[in-house]
Amino acid sequence: GTEEEWNIAGGQSDTLESMKVCRKISKAIFVCKRGSLGCTVFKDDISNWSNGITVPVREIEIFNVLGAGDGFMAGFLKGWLKGEELKKCSEFANACGALAVSRHGCAPSYPSVEELNYFISFGSNEYSLRKDKKLEQIHWSTNRRIKYSQLFAFAFDHRKQFLNWAKKSNKTENDIDVFKTLALEVAVSLKKDFPNIGILVDDELGRSALQKASDYEMWIGRPIEVSGKYPLELTNEQNLTAYLSEWPINHCVKVLAPMRMDDNLELKIQNENKILSLYNACRNTNHEFLLEIITGYSEKNTDPEQIVELIKRFYELGIFPDWWKIEPVKDKNFWKMTCEFVNSNDPYTNGVVVLGKDTDQEHMIDVFNATQKEKLIKGFAIGRTIFSEAAKKWLNDEISNDCAKDIMSNKLKKLIKIWENSRN
């Protein structure tokens, strides 16, 4: 307990004297929390403070006192239950208490084991620990609600393409919404056999599917970029935090960023500022963030070297996506270099998923094979390769709902099998 708590327990105004009184009736290990002096642990004799094991702390900002005691106890017990020395138990306790009081909130501010070990090993130069970006990144990325070993995302968040097809077929946005519900049903029907299936769907043309998806335990990605706009434009980009605060917490914010290192300087700065603002908004609202880099656009081909340079640039800006979504490159060396670079900057990232870019399944065989040795690559987020044929035929009234679902289901299953074969 704190000095005040020991004074109450022992009935004395002097803390040491109070602890002596308590020692007469208990042989337990006593821990006294002494604020800025750290803590002192007494295993036996309590004749003076030097008889105990004192573990100091450095001065930090006390931002929030709620939960400090429980945090301290959690840290001490972490060491105690594993048979650590009392000094080590106290180091854990002090660190957990310090991190708790330096952040807003109570239990959510407590560190993960990885964060705790990092803080004890390297400390922080910040007086306000919550302003230590490295520490905050570790806190965020090691306390995620769900960790994914694989992710097979059926992406049907496309809007411009669906509107073009619907226009040619004299169909409405309501028809598109119905089709996207069929796509969701495909994902749900396969989830029993492939539990790592997820979806990417928008709330403009696919709102019904997006709402129904919440009934199932699956990964849900949701786009925030305005479809078909170049340069990059974000929905409600003037008030992103307020906008995202309305999203369910399990919706991963996805942004498709058409960017290249050889864009003109003004455009590069504009895009970087938008993505940085979006990233900060996601952290403010506790939403995970998926960054999709597209270098092949406006008649320019995919450029693997630029993808790596863009990833490097985003880390320089302090942007740490929870997921990277990368163009389908066939080069093994590219994937090796990309994963090594991501790991060196953010070892706790969820991982990388490969996008399809409307390529055929034969192409994806080569891409998946090129990624096979990289554990950081968790799967794919592919759309048109799966739904294009079914969507066009369905919008033209050439096939039924069940037929459309069968086409999409078979293609999605085949992609998953191709992925699994590349890993065997």
Predicted segments — roles?
Residues E217-I220, T285-F289, N345-D360:
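Short beta-strand/loop segments at the ligand-binding rim of alpha/beta enzyme cores
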Residues Q12-K133:
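Conserved phosphate-binding/catalytic region of the ribokinase-like
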Residues N94, S214, L276-Y279, R283:
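Anion (oxyanion) recognition and catalysis
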Residues I146, K160, M259-D262, Y297-E305, ...:
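Domain-level signal for soluble alpha/beta catalytic cores
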Residues T181-V188, Q238-C252, L267, K274-I275, ...:
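Alpha/beta enzyme core
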Residues F154, E292, W324, G383:
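Conserved, mostly hydrophobic/aromatic
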Residues E5-N7, C39, L116, F387:
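A generic structural signal for short hydrophobic patches within well-formed alpha-helices
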Residues E126-L267, F320, N350, Q361-T371, ...:
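Alpha/beta catalytic barrel-like cores
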